[in-house]
């Protein structure tokens, strides 16, 4: 949303059919919009770890930023401070698995890009919120996989993305859906390179996260 005022106006309007439980302005102000025990309209058509329509089982936080369409910019320090504090309080009230701390783009990669590649997921992970790749071991080299590839290697990496939680068909065809899922993964975990290609760097991070998640 371009501003907190526009975000709040939209999220309290019944006709908009869009809402979240919380909203954080660029100055760090936190607004409570919907009680956490009630369903908000923030996830939309979505999928994560075998579940559809995540509005029923998730807590949504809107962080004010113009976004990619209107001048995307880094999130402010007051916003991030407030977000860390809010998330830590939410986690005290709700037993949320670290893998289930996700971006809108993770659960709806064909529709959404937020919060995007300027969002500091590593900071949240250092505070016990979600996961982040650290101490990455190098996986065996493979040639980059990209749009229109069709082979068993594609199917292998599709299955790994699905194991982490993403929703995609595991058919060995590197179609548009797979490319969008890879870009969503990169926006979250490899923000310096968002090209939809599974190269050595992206595959290393994915392998690391899968192994890390198994230990949680």
Protein language model regions, located:
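Acidic/histidine-rich, metal-coordinating catalytic segments
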Residues: 96-111
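A charge-rich, low-complexity, intrinsically flexible signal that marks solvent-exposed coils, linkers
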Residues: 48, 114-117
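A generic structural signal for short coil/turn motifs at secondary-structure boundaries
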Residues: 69-73, 109-111, 169, 193
